[in-house]
Amino acid sequence: MRIAVIADTHDRLPPRVLAAIRSADEIWHLGDVCNEAIESALLATRIPLRIVRGNCDSNPGWPLTLDFTLEGFRIHLIHIPPTVAPPDTDLLFHGHTHVPRHEIMVPARFHNPGCITRPNRGAPASFAWLELIKGEAPKWTLEYV
C-alpha cells in the first residue's frame, strides 16, 4: 500500500502536489488544513482520505487523533507531536513543526512529512510517501516540491 502523507497545507495545495499524490492508495493529512476547499480537492481525487485536526483548524468533524491498524502496523495520526507514543503504536505520524522527521523512539517510529507551503528551519518544502507491506519494514520517502 502506498500512502501520500501531507501536513500543514495552511490554505494552499499546489497543483503539482495534487497531481503527484493521485497515484496514492490513500492520502493522510496531518492537520492545519485551514481551508475546507483543500479537503474538497483531496476528496475529488476519490482516493481514501484520513484527516486529523491541527491547531489552526476549526472543523469539529476532523478528529484530533486517529488510531488504526494497516498492513499489520498499529498507526497513530496526530497534529502536534507527543513526547512519547501512545501504547501499542508502531508508527506515529505528526505535523505541526513544518520540519521533516524520521526518528525511532522505541517502541515507535515518529514521522513528519514536513510542510508543502511554509517549511521551517531551512527545510525544503516537502510531503512524504509511505509504503506499507505486511511483514516488511515500512518505507518512508520524502518528496521535495
Model-derived segments and spans:
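Helix-adjacent hinge/juxtasegments
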Residues: 48-87
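Active-site neighborhood of phospho(di)ester-bond hydrolases with catalytic His/Asp-centered motifs
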Residues: 5-7, 26-32, 50-55, 76-79, ...
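Short, flexible, glycine/charge-rich loop motifs used to bind or transfer phosphoryl groups or to couple energy/partner
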Residues: 15-20, 38-40, 65-66, 79-85, ...
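Short, glycine/serine-rich, charged loops/turns that create anion-binding
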Residues: 10, 34, 56, 98, ...
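N-terminal active-site segment of His-dependent metallophosphoesterases
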Residues: 1-49, 57-64, 123-126
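Non-DNA-binding regulatory cores of transcription-related proteins
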Residues: 87-105
